[in-house]
């Protein structure tokens, strides 16, 4: 129980709260772990402590650990495995720890879906499902849904007496299609599956529209909207109070005070009615009458103050007017009539959803496939049964799991949904006060509501649990951040203390939620957080809204490029924890975070123009790639050659190679009919002499096309694709174009996608093309195949969602002026987990439509949830930075925006007014008003502290706030008219007259010789091994670079693979063993065998490599004098990688190029030992020596010294440069014969 917690050890690295999270038990525990607070380390330590404790240790397979991703589950297993191995070192005889290591692989450490799969596999006989089922591909799932839905609607259209269905169709479809109705059915199906009992949720949705015998006060929508009415009236009241304050200033329009006070009285009456009922507000709204403002002579008063007073009063009147128009222009009973009228239609809609769900499940069952929601619901079906009162209760299987699991630990709990919560509930104990559920997460980082994650589950427990755990569950706050500098944390806290609250934001950013400094950094320069606001003037914007967006992306990209280049060129210093020192910033240290990726291509282009290497994992552009587009058109033509546009595209492409004139000639042969019919007719006749070339091209293609069409009917799609690649030569052709490897990779991806498609339940080319269309309709373009890896030294661009869990020294958060995506709020129908279904009232006979109460309530609720989600997304973005945070946004009229943001300066509390926070349309609407209350904004505003409380104005954060003129970032228009004419002449292949002033320049360029020709035949980066070979070669390095380009050696055929490992593979295996051998244990055959087995288990060695290792030779080394020195050394480092700069003359014997040139050398040192009198370098060799030299080892020794002298000299030089200590001895150790060779200079 709680009283028996172990005390935190002396000198422990854990904070008090972390230790509490590690050892607390006896009830359900919720750990609210802030960004960078070490939650994974805490979770692993808790598991380890449970496994290794002396009293009642728990077997690892009696713990259920639920992670958010498979990668996180694997990392968790690895960490636990490493921790157990460390424990085993201290107590090698512990059978319990050995048992845990053997149980680890089958322990329940996985995603919730993997756990569901485990339950279903074990109890499939309780379900109507084939035990050999497979997980459905997402696109395959969508196509199946489409098929099922088409069949259902076709049946409904065929029923004669089906008036309610046709009423539904009339209301929710257009003249052209019933796509909207299909979308409604699919959306309701998806939303229902996010609930433990989908049918029950659907039934409640219909019940909400059954208003027989009810008043408007009984409707949940009305009660919710009344709260919103109060909110808007409070906002209006604040505007009038502020206007009154301004009017009463010495230079304010005092005559208007009387009118403003009457306004306050009117708003007070409305607010009083809102505290009553809907009807009372309706009646009060009918009597609203605003007094006319008294005329004043504006010159007698401060004109700006008068404008401000009038503006605030107009805002207040607009708030009331909006309420009148949206909610109180109709009598309450008319809203009830809407519900009555829509009830039978909605009932029919829900019936269709239920039929669809039943049929869809049946077809998946027939095809032996399930999707991820099926996994959750099937698992829940096994774990639950219905009680007498109709509620769900644990089944016998669930009780078995309860007995099995000593504790259930859930990572990223804030991203759990209702179904997953039910599954977890059924395998854990009933009562929170005696529970065994341990949950870790941060609701401030819950950013997956679009995946139906429910942050309310976390929030409910956080509010309910106490820090003492009295009477229920316990909550523990981990607020210390071990990732970021003080400036990043203080800057983030300063913003979120002002914008995140329970009413707007769903959680209070209080003292417990604030980020607290846990990391230590050396003093740094220029580490203040920054806000750069770009002013985009109207003149700079072209092509309307779309042009403005492109312009914003370009402006922000240029500003970021300037900053990145400046920071890299100046050697801006960042802290490197590995070396515990400051180092110059590299491109890999930068990340650019975006809310979504539409701007990414423009930003990439701008950065590349500035010479900045950049990488973005774009999920778009694949099907737009020219080579993919052409191939897709080929397949469309194979499927149906009567399609003119695809066929014309193929004929015009390099595959056939017709030019515009030839295409026109072909069309002229038949003005009617399709291109294909014209082509067929043209090929049947005898061509004119001038048309012979055209005839030959078309004949070649026509024969291929007929062959492909026949092949497509009989063979697999993937074989067809490869056949087309080969017979057209197009795959080889694109390989010769610029970015050829990328293009070929794209074509291979298309082939792979066809293979994936063929693994589904669909077949054939037509279905494949439909499959691809569905991908594009869903917006799931795949992105081009990767040509640049994520580990390169490049600036990364990614979405904020992708960055979650990552950290970077320098973070740019861009696009902060882009509007929030509110498209979901504009749909014809809305769905909500609590409020169900809402849509416009549509009367097709009268041709009228208007907003309903349910639609207004759901829209308001979804808007507030969207605002809360966007706050959490911003929090994730800001907390990725370790050392430097730079925020960038663009506005069209900075002065106008600043005037709006300055409203916040008058507010006297930390949390900004609700209407400012709820009315935000972009991130800048939160960030700028917050920063305008900080002293560091004075560099921009020069307004003084005013009424801002000192604790806010003087808050310890450091900020730089700057407005950047967009016109200063735009490059001048390129190129003079003369140059343009020259380019056009060259493009048209016309002779260019050479004027005398250009003559010398042209000749110089034509006769130019590259000044570093020798460098082209020598690599700028070499490995030590390559340099060694260069010195051994009689030819030196002449043409060595060209030799590297020879065709790669093919993989050994399978019939040769059985003959064992190559010498190189054996050597690699021995080096791996020497790297991992535990020097603290006695080096015996048993210990080495156990170690090799562990390495095989971890996939560090293959079984074949393990069998080939001569253990006795490893033992011989440690029995030798040199091996004993290794065991006795002060410190031992193995497999030490290094890079260093070396002069080209040292690296290449034949270097004739410029003196002073350097090359980058890289290598790995096998072993270095530090003894009392210095450092010794050891290189292990597996060369075969015995029997190869007639004179034995004495004859071999000079040859071996000569062979490896250069290599070890370079190793020694690298060590001496990095360690600043001389290497006293360089040794070669040969396992064959147990020989040691000392290398002398």
Swiss-Prot record:
TM segment ranges: none
Family: Belongs to the helicase family. AddA subfamily.
GO molecular function: 3'-5' DNA helicase activity; 3'-5' exonuclease activity; ATP binding; ATP hydrolysis activity; double-stranded DNA binding
Subunit structure: Heterodimer of AddA and AddB/RexB.
Residue numbers binding ATP: 33-40
Function: The heterodimer acts as both an ATP-dependent DNA helicase and an ATP-dependent, dual-direction single-stranded exonuclease. Recognizes the chi site generating a DNA molecule suitable for the initiation of homologous recombination. The AddA nuclease domain is required for chi fragment generation; this subunit has the helicase and 3' -> 5' nuclease activities.
Residues of the UvrD-like helicase ATP-binding domain: 12-485
Name of protein: ATP-dependent helicase/nuclease subunit A
Cofactor: Mg(2+)
Encoding gene (name): addA
Pfam families: PDDEXK_1, UvrD-helicase, UvrD_C
Keywords (A to Z) from UniProt: ATP-binding, DNA damage, DNA repair, DNA-binding, Exonuclease, Helicase, Hydrolase, Isomerase, Nuclease, Nucleotide-binding
Biological processes annotated in GO: double-strand break repair via homologous recombination
The EC number(s) this enzyme carries: 3.1.-.-, 5.6.2.4
NCBIfam families in alphabetical order: addA_Gpos
Catalysed transformations (reactions): Couples ATP hydrolysis with the unwinding of duplex DNA by translocating in the 3'-5' direction; ATP + H2O = ADP + phosphate + H(+)
UniProt superkingdom: Bacteria
């Amino acid at each position: 129980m709680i009283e028996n917690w172990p005390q935190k050890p002396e000198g422990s690295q854990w904070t008090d709260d972390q230790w509490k999270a590690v050892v607390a038990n006896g009830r359900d525990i919720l750990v609210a772990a802030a960004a960078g607070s070490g939650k994974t380390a805490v979770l692993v330590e808790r598991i380890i402590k449970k496994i290794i404790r002396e009293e009642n240790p728990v077997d690892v397979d009696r713990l259920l650990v639920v992670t958010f991703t498979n990668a996180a589950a694997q990392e968790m297993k690895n960490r636990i495995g490493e921790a157990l191995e460390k424990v085993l070192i201290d107590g090698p005889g512990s059978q319990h720890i050995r048992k845990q290591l053997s149980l680890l692989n089958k322990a329940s450490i996985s995603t919730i879906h993997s756990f569901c799969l485990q339950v279903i596999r074990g109890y499939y006989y309780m379900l109507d499902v084939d035990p050999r089922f497979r997980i459905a591909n997402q696109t395959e799932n969508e196509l199946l849904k489409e098929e099922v839905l088409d069949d259902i609607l076709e049946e409904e259209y065929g029923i004669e007496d089906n008036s309610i269905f046709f009423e539904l169709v009339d209301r929710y479809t257009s003249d052209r299609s019933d796509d909207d109705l299909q979308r409604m059915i699919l959306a309701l199906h998806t939303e229902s599956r996010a609930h433990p009992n989908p049918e029950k949720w659907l039934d409640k949705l219909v019940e909400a529209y059954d208003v027989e015998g009810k008043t408007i006060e009984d409707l949940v929508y009305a009660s919710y909207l009344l709260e919103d009415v109060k909110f808007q009236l409070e906002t209006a009241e604040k505007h009038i109070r502020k206007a009154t304050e301004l009017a009463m200033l010495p230079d304010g329009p005092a005559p208007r005070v009387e009118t403003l006070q009457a306004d306050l009285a009117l708003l007070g009456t409305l607010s009083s009615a809102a505290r009553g009922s809907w009807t009372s507000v309706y009646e009060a709204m009918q009597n609203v009458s605003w007094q006319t403002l008294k005329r004043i002579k504006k010159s007698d008063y401060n004109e700006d103050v008068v404008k401000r007073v009038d503006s605030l009063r107009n805002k207040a009147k607009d708030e009331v007017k909006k309420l009148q128009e949206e909610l109180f222009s109709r009598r309450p009973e008319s809203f009830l009539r809407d519900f009555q009228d829509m009830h039978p239609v909605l009932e029919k809609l829900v019936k269709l959803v239920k039929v669809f769900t039943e049929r869809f499940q049946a077809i998946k069952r027939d095809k032996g496939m399930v999707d991820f929601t099926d996994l959750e619901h099937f698992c829940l079906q096994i774990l639950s049964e219905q009680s007498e009162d109709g509620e769900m209760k644990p089944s016998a299987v669930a009780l078995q799991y309860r007995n099995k699991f000593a504790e259930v630990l859930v990572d990223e709990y804030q991203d759990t949904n209702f179904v997953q919560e039910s599954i977890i509930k059924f395998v854990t104990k009933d009562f929170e006060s005696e529970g065994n559920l341990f949950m870790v997460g941060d609701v401030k980082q819950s950013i997956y509501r679009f995946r139906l994650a429910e942050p309310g589950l976390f929030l409910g427990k956080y509010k309910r649990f106490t820090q003492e755990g009295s009477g229920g569950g316990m909550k523990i706050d981990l607020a210390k951040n071990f990732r970021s500098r003080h400036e990043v944390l203080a800057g983030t806290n300063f913003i979120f203390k002002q914008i995140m609250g329970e009413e707007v934001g769903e959680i209070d950013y209080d003292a417990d939620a604030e980020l607290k400094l846990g990391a230590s950094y050396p003093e740094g320069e220029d580490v203040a957080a920054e806000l750069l606001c770009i002013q985009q003037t109207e003149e700079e914007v072209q092509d309307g809204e779309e042009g403005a967006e492109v312009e914003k992306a370009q402006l922000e990209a240029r500003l970021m490029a300037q900053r990145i280049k400046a920071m890299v060129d100046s050697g801006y210093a960042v802290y490197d924890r590995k070396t515990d020192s400051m180092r110059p910033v590299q491109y890999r240290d930068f990340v650019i975070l975006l809310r979504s990726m539409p701007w990414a291509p423009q930003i990439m282009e701008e950065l590349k123009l500035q010479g900045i290497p950049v990488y973005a994992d774009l999920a778009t552009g694949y099907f737009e790639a020219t080579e993919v587009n052409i191939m897709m058109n080929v397949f469309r033509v194979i499927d149906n050659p009567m399609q003119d546009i695809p066929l014309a595209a193929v004929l015009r492409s390099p595959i056939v190679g017709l030019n515009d004139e030839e295409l026109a000639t072909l069309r002229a042969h038949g003005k009617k009919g399709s291109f294909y019919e014209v082509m067929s007719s043209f090929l049947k006749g005898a061509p004119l002499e001038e048309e012979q070339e055209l005839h030959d091209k078309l004949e070649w293609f026509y024969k291929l096309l007929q062959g492909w069409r026949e092949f497509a009917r009989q063979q697999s799609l993937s074989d067809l694709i490869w056949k087309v690649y080969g017979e057209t030569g197009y795959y080889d052709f694109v390989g010769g174009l610029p970015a050829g490897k990328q293009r070929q990779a794209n074509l291979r991806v298309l082939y792979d996608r066809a293979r994936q498609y063929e693994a589904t339940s669909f077949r054939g080319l037509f279905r494949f093309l439909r499959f691809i269309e569905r991908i594009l309709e869903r917006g799931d373009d795949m992105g081009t195949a990767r040509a640049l890896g994520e580990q390169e030294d490049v600036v990364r661009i990614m979405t904020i969602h992708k960055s979650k869990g990552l950290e970077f020294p320098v973070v740019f958060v861009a696009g902060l002026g882009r509007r929030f995506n509110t498209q979901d709020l504009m749909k014809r129908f809305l769905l909500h987990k609590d409020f169900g279904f809402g849509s416009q009232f549509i009367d097709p006979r009268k041709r009228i439509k208007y907003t309903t109460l349910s639609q207004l309530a759901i829209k308001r609720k979804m808007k507030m949830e969207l605002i809360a989600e966007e706050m959490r997304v911003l929090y994730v973005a800001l907390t990725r930075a370790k050392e430097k945070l730079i925020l960038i946004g663009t506005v069209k009229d900075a002065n106008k925006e600043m005037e709006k943001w300055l409203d916040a300066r008058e507010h006297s509390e930390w949390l900004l007014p609700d209407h400012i926070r709820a009315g935000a349309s972009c991130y800048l609407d939160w960030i700028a008003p917050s920063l305008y209350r900080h002293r560091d904004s004075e560099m921009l505003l020069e307004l003084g502290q005013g009424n801002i409380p000192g604790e806010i104005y003087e808050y310890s954060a450091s900020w730089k706030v700057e407005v950047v003129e967009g016109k200063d970032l735009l490059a001048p228009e390129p190129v003079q008219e003369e140059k343009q004419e020259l380019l056009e002449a060259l493009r048209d292949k016309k002779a260019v007259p050479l004027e005398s002033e250009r003559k010398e320049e042209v000749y110089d360029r034509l006769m130019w010789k590259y000044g570093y020709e020798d460098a082209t035949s020598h690599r700028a980066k070499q490995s030590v091994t390559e340099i060694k070979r260069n010195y051994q070669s009689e030819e030196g390095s002449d043409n060595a670079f060209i030799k590297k380009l020879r065709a790669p050696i093919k993989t050994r055929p399978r019939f040769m693979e059985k003959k064992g490992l190559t010498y190189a593979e054996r050597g690699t295996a021995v080096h791996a063993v020497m790297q991992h051998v535990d020097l603290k244990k006695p080096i015996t055959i048993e210990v080495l065998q156990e170690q090799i087995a562990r390495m095989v288990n971890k996939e560090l060695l293959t079984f074949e490599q393990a069998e080939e290792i001569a253990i006795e030779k490893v033992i011989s080394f440690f029995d030798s004098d040199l091996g004993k020195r290794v065991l006795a050394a002060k410190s031992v480092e193995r497999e030490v990688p290094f890079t260093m700069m070396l002069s080209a003359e040292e690296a290449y014997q034949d270097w004739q190029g410029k003196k002073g040139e350097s090359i980058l050398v890289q290598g790995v040192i096998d072993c270095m030992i530090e003894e009392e009198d210095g450092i010794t370098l050891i290189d292990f060799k597996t060369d075969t020596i015995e029997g190869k030299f007639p004179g034995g080892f004495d004859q071999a020794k000079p040859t071996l010294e000569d062979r490896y002298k250069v290599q070890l000299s370079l190793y020694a030089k690298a060590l001496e440069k990095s360690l600043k200590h001389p290497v006293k001895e360089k040794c070669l150790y040969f396992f064959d014969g147990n020989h040691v060779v000392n290398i002398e200079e």
